[in-house]
Amino acid sequence: MFSVIVVDDEMMIRTSISAFINNCDVGFEVVGTFRDGSDAIKYLEENNVDLVISDIRMVQVSGIDLAQYIYENKPWT
């Protein structure tokens, strides 16, 4: 099972993507959802995931900034 986190500032989007992934039964499991890149970074500091699905435009930390953090600190994600 591959672990996934979903990062989006809109709850309906997070919920929809998570439900879709979890209901597809294709080997992916959503292990966390976050409304901002800063929340996702806090999670990633303590946990490893296989895939991050992120919005680009978010209030505090954008998806671009999150991608930069992942590139520098978790390149296997």
Functional labels for PLM-detected ranges:
Residues I5, S54-D55:
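Active-site T/S-Asp motif of two-component receiver
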Residues K42, I64-W76:
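Short amphipathic alpha-helix used as the core "switch/output" element in two-component signaling
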Residues S18, T33-L51:
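Acidic, metal-coordinating helix/loop segments flanking the phosphotransfer/catalytic sites
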Residues D36, V61-L66:
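Acidic catalytic/metal-coordinating carboxylates
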Residues M58:
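Receiver (REC) domain active-site loop signature in two-component systems and cognate sites
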Residues D8:
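Conserved acidic carboxylate
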Residues F2, N48-D50, K74-T77:
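His-Asp phosphorelay/catalytic-motif detector in bacterial-type signaling
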Residues M11-G32:
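Two-component/phosphorelay signaling modules centered on CheY-like receiver
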